[in-house]
C-alpha cells in the first residue's frame, strides 16, 4: 500500500493549531502555562512580509506576478478562515486547550459577500490598493459589436447564468510537516507544486529559496486546491521559532472547506443577436467572479473562462468584460477546469435559450454552428485541425438513443417528467500563451537494464506516472515493467517542474521524456557500438530491451 503523507514522518512532532475568529484585532492572553504548550505566536510576532500563494511559475515581469497579499498571520480579518494566532504544542489536546484559553479583542467591520454589492462605491474595501474591490478587469473586443447589433431583422436573446462556490473534497485533507536540518528548512507536504512551494516559503520568510527543501510524497488527491501554498509557509516559520523541531500542521474537513481554496462562483451575462437562420451577428458576455478575501489564482480563472467564449460558436463581433472581485468569503483558487466549467455552463445554457427562441433542435443547431475545422483562435493563434466535436456528438446521440427519447419526452405533463439534452465542452491543456511551459526529466540506467525515471511533474492520483512510464519505455525500447517512476518529488534532487495543473503533465512532460529517452537510447547504442564495432546506424533496441544489429 502506498504511504500517505501522514505516515511519512516520525511520530515525535509538535502540533500546531491556528486560531480563526470572525472579526478583527487580537489581544493575547497568556496560555503558555498549559501543560504541553511550547509556543504561542500571534499576528504581531510574525514577519510582515506579504507573499503570493498561487501555484504559478515565477515571472521576472512584475505585471505578470501573482498578487502578494498574504501574511503568515494577520491582524486584519477579511473572512472567517483568517489565521490570527497559532499555538505550538506537544499534542492536539494541549493546542486546543491553549486556543480556548486565549482571549481575543475584536473590532467589527462591515462585510460584503455579493460581487455586485462589492463593486459599489460605498462598499467596504477589503484591500485598499484595489478600488471598488476589483482585483482585475479584462476585455475582449473582436469586430464592432455595437454596429453589428443594429443589423435589421436580428433576434435578441439574453440571459444571466450563475455557478456556485464548491470545494474540491479530495479524500486527504491538506497537511504538512516542517523541521530544520543543517540550517535549512525541510518540508513534507501534500502539495501539487513542490518546487513552487519552495519558492513561496522562501519569499514568505525572507530567506534564499535554496535554504528550503520540499518533499512531496504520494498524496490523496488535490484537484487544484493543493496548487496553492496553503500552510507550508506558516508551518515552516513555526518550526524556526521552536528551535527547528518537527512541527505538524493538518487541516480538519471543516478547515479544508473554510481555510483552503474553493471554486470561483461566477455570474455571467450573455446577449446574442441572432439571425433567423441561427448565425450570430454579434455577441456580448460579462463575467463577475467572486474571488473571496484574497487573490490566490485571482483573475486567471475568469479570464480563461471568458477567453473560451468566442471559439466554440464563432462570431465576428464579440464584446467581453471579465471582473474578479474581492468579497468576505473564503478565497477562491484553482479547481479542475480552471474557469472553463463555469464558462461552458453559461455558454451552453445560453445556446439552449437561443434554440428555444428559434424553435430549432439544439443538437442540430450545434452541428451547424459550432467551431469548424480550420478555425483559428484570434488570441492563441491555435488552429482546429480535427472534426472531433462532430464525432462526439454522433457517438453521444447513438449511445443515448437521443432522437427517440427526444420525441418520446416531447409532450409530457405532471410533476415528474423525463428529459434528454446535450451540451458541448472544450478545454485546452497547458498554460501557453499566457505563460511559457517547461518540464525536466532525468533517466538513470540501472545495472540490470531497467531505468529510473524522475520528473518534476507530480502524481496526485490522475495517472500521469503510468503515462510517463509508457512513454519512457517506448522512447528507450524497453518493457514498461522495467521503468521505475520515482513518485515522490524532492526539490533537492528532482529535476525542476512546475507541478500538477492545467491537464498538462502528460502533454508537456511527454516532450521532456521523449527527448531524454532518445538521448539515453543514443548513449546506450553508442556504447554497444564500441563493444561490437558495428556502425551506430546498424544497431537498435528492439524486442523489449534487446540490442540487435541489422548488418
Name each region found by the language model.
Residues 1-10, 169-174, 318-329, 437, ...:
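Flexible hinge/switch segments at interdomain interfaces of large molecular machines
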Residues 60-67, 132-176, 265-349, 428-438, ...:
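Glycine-rich loop/linker segments at domain edges
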Residues 1-131, 159:
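Flexible, low-hydrophobicity surface segments
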Residues 57, 119-205, 369-450:
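Helix-loop-helix junctions that connect adjacent transmembrane helices in secondary transporters/permeases
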Residues 13-47, 84-106, 175-243, 300-310, ...:
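Alpha-helical support elements that line or immediately flank enzyme active sites
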Residues 110-116, 360-369, 403-415, 480-484, ...:
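Flexible, glycine/charged-enriched surface loops at secondary-structure junctions
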Amino acid at each position: 500500500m502506498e504511504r500517505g503523507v501522514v505516515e511519512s514522518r516520525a511520530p515525535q512532532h509538535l502540533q500546531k493549531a491556528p486560531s480563526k475568529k470572525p472579526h478583527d484585532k487580537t489581544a493575547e492572553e497568556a496560555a503558555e502555562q498549559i501543560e504541553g504548550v511550547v509556543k504561542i505566536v500571534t499576528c504581531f510576532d510574525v514577519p510582515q512580509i506579504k507573499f503570493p500563494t498561487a501555484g504559478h511559475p515565477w515571472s521576472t515581469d512584475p505585471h505578470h506576478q501573482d498578487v502578494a497579499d498574504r501574511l503568515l498571520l494577520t491582524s486584519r480579518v477579511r473572512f472567517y478562515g483568517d489565521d490570527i494566532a497559532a499555538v505550538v504544542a506537544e499534542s492536539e489536546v494541549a493546542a486546543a486547550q491553549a486556543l480556548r484559553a486565549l482571549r481575543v479583542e475584536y473590532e467589527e467591520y462591515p462585510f460584503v459577500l455579493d460581487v455586485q454589492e462589492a463593486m459599489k462605491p460605498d462598499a467596504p474595501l477589503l484591500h485598499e490598493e484595489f478600488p471598488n474591490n476589483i482585483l482585475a478587469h479584462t476585455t475582449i473586443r473582436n469586430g464592432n459589436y455595437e454596429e453589428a447589433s443594429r443589423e435589421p431583422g436580428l433576434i435578441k436573446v439574453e440571459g444571466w447564468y450563475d455557478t456556485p462556490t464548491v470545494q474540491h473534497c479530495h479524500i486527504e485533507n491538506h497537511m504538512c510537516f516542517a523541521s530544520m536540518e543543517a540550517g535549512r528548512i525541510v518540508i513534507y507536504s501534500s502539495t501539487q507544486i513542490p518546487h513552487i512551494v519552495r519558492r513561496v516559503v522562501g519569499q514568505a520568510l525572507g530567506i534564499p529559496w535554496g535554504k528550503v527543501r520540499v518533499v512531496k510524497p504520494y498524496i490523496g488527491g488535490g484537484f487544484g486546491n493543493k496548487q496553492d501554498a496553503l500552510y507550508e509557509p506558516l508551518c515552516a516559520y513555526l518550526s524556526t521559532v521552536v528551535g527547528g523541531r518537527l512541527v505538524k500542521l493538518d487541516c480538519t474537513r471543516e478547515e479544508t472547506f473554510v481555510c483552503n481554496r474553493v471554486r470561483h462562483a461566477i455570474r455571467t451575462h450573455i446577449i446574442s443577436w441572432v439571425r433567423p437562420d441561427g448565425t450570430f451577428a454579434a455577441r456580448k458576455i460579462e463575467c463577475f467572479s467572486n474571488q473571496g478575501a484574497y487573490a490566490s489564482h485571482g483573475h486567471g480563472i475568469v479570464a480563461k473562462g471568458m477567453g473560451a467564449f468566442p471559439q466554440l460558436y464563432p462570431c465576428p463581433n464579440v464584446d467581453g468584460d471579465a471582473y474578479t472581485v474581492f468579497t468576505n468569503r473564503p478565497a477562491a483558487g484553482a479547481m479542475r477546469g480552471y474557469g472553463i466549467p463555469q464558462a461552458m455552463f453559461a455558454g451552453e445554457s445560453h445556446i439552449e435559450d437561443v434554440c428555444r427562441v428559434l424553435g430549432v433542435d439544439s443538437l442540430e443547431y450545434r452541428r451547424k454552428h459550432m467551431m469548424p475545422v480550420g478555425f483559428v483562435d484570434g488570441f492563441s493563434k491555435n488552429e482546429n485541425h480535427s472534426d472531433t466535436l462532430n464525432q462526439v456528438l454522433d457517438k453521444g446521440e447513438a449511445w443515448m438513443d437521443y432522437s427517440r427519447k427526444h420525441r418520446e419526452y416531447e409532450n409530457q405533463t405532471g410533476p415528474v417528467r423525463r428529459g434528454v439534452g446535450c451540451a458541448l465542452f472544450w478545454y485546452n491543456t497547458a498554460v501557453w500563451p499566457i505563460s511559457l511551459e517547461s518540464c525536466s526529466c532525468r533517466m538513470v540506467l540501472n545495472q540490470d537494464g531497467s531505468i529510473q525515471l524522475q520528473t518534476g511533474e507530480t502524481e496526485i492520483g490522475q495517472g500521469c506516472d503510468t503515462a510517463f512510464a509508457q512513454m519512457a519505455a517506448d522512447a528507450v525500447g524497453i518493457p514498461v515493467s522495467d521503468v521505475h517512476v520515482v513518485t515522490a518529488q524532492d526539490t533537492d534532487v528532482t529535476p525542476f517542474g512546475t507541478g500538477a495543473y492545467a491537464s498538462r503533465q502528460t502533454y508537456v512532460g511527454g516532450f521532456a521524456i521523449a527527448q531524454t529517452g532518445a538521448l539515453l537510447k543514443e548513449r546506450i547504442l553508442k556504447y554497444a557500438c564500441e563493444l561490437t564495432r558495428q556502425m551506430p546506424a546498424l544497431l537498435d533496441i528492439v524486442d523489449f530491451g534487446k540490442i540487435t544489429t541489422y548488418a
